[in-house]
């Protein structure tokens, strides 16, 4: 949806002119070595090992005349803009700006309404970064003893805690909200970011996350879009709680550790899909950085599409308990109609 507004914010014909004035083979050629035997420069027909997954054969094809690429291995496809976006790990508009500079085009002024939506998202992302820092600060404070004891019991090192920016939400109702209000952030923006709740009776807002270990969820551009929180109270109604859906966060279209795993997967030629945050973090500590987790009890079709974009045959690692086996069966039911050449699944059922 966000890309839709960015498209609208650019004048008609600008993206088409940008694509026409850009050489896809030059853009891609900075990232790959062309296979000389298969490549026919005169026809604009280029082949190389895919830059998005690990392979020895040249299955990545660029049609320079049409301006499109396609990988016959991992099925990654697109144009010069999408290639820059995915290979440089930048947003759509940042990719457009990079390509425009290379093509010698000046970026036009954008539509005010569409620009307003982009500015709102940037503001929410800034609020989320403030929350990340607040939770990290609280984790290092005296009120987080139980949280630190739990993390210590899981064997996590200081380095891995810092890498994943693990934090703590205090148990009182308004600690984060008050912190953000004191920074001049408006109440409605704190709610829009998914960090606070306004009661139905119109009373004062209160923090969504209280008494929880906090895990920032970042998108592929590295921006914090949501949080996951693990309750310290064994009697809490929900052991794990995610952010509600916001302008930044669509749970069914997001993965935990997506950006890092996508990069690491190319080197490892593998992808592990774990059950939750702690599984991904533990795997990373032991060198398996190519791991992601869904943000709920079941993998959605959109998440499965994201997973297959990272690797054509991911390993689904699930606990061998009843819940884990049920999750495996649900995923099998979801995946079976979608299986095709270059898209499959492997399952690793872990012992209890």
Question: Where are the language model's segments positioned?
Answer:
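Phosphate-handling DNA/RNA-contact segment within nucleic-acid enzymes
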Residues: 1-7, 20-22, 42, 116-124, ...
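N-terminal structured subdomain of primase-like DNA metabolism proteins
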Residues: 1-115, 171, 177
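Hydrophobic alpha-helical scaffolding
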Residues: 14-18, 70, 74, 85-89, ...
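Conserved nucleotide-binding/hydrolysis micro-motifs of P-loop NTPases
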Residues: 54, 75-76, 231-232, 278, ...
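Amphipathic alpha-helical segments at domain termini/boundaries
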Residues: 94-125, 129, 153-156, 352
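Terminal amphipathic helices with adjacent charged low-complexity linkers/tails
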Residues: 161-163, 168-169
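Conserved phosphate-handling catalytic cores of large alpha/beta enzymes
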Residues: 299-352
């Amino acid at each position: 949806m966000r890309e839709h507004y960015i498209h609208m914010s650019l004048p008609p014909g600008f993206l088409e002119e940008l694509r026409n004035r850009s050489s896809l083979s030059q853009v891609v050629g900075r990232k790959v070595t062309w296979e000389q035997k298969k490549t026919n420069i005169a026809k604009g027909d280029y082949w190389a090992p895919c830059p998005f997954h690990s392979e020895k054969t040249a299955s990545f094809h660029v049609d320079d005349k049409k301006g499109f690429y396609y990988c016959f291995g991992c099925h990654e496809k697109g144009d010069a803009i999408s290639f820059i976006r995915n290979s440089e790990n930048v947003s759509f508009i940042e990719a457009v700006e990079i390509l425009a500079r290379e093509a010698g085009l000046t970026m036009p002024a954008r539509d005010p309404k569409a620009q307003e939506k982009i500015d709102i998202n940037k503001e929410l992302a800034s609020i989320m970064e403030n929350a990340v820092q607040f939770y990290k600060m609280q984790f290092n404070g005296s009120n987080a003893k139980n949280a630190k004891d739990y993390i210590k019991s899981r064997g996590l090192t200081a380095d891995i805690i810092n890498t994943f920016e693990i934090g703590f939400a205090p148990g009182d109702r308004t600690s984060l909200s008050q912190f953000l209000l004191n920074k001049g952030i408006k109440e409605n923006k704190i709610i829009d970011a998914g960090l606070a709740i306004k009661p139905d009776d119109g009373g004062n807002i209160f923090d969504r996350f209280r008494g929880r270990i906090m895990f920032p969820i970042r998108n592929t551009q590295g921006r914090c879009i949501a949080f996951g929180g693990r309750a310290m109270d064994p009697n809490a109604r929900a052991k794990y709680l995610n952010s509600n859906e916001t302008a930044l966060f669509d749970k069914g279209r997001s993965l935990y550790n997506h950006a890092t795993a996508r990069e690491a997967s190319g080197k490892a030629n593998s992808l592990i899909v774990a059950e939750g945050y702690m599984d991904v973090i533990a795997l990373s500590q032991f060198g398996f950085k190519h791991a992601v987790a869904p943000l709920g009890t079941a993998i959605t079709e959109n998440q499965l599409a994201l997973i297959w974009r990272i690797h054509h045959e991911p390993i689904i690692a699930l606990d061998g308990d009843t819940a884990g086996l049920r999750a495996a069966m649900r995923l099998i039911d979801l995946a079976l109609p979608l299986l095709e050449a270059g898209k499959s699944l492997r399952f690793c059922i872990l012992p209890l």
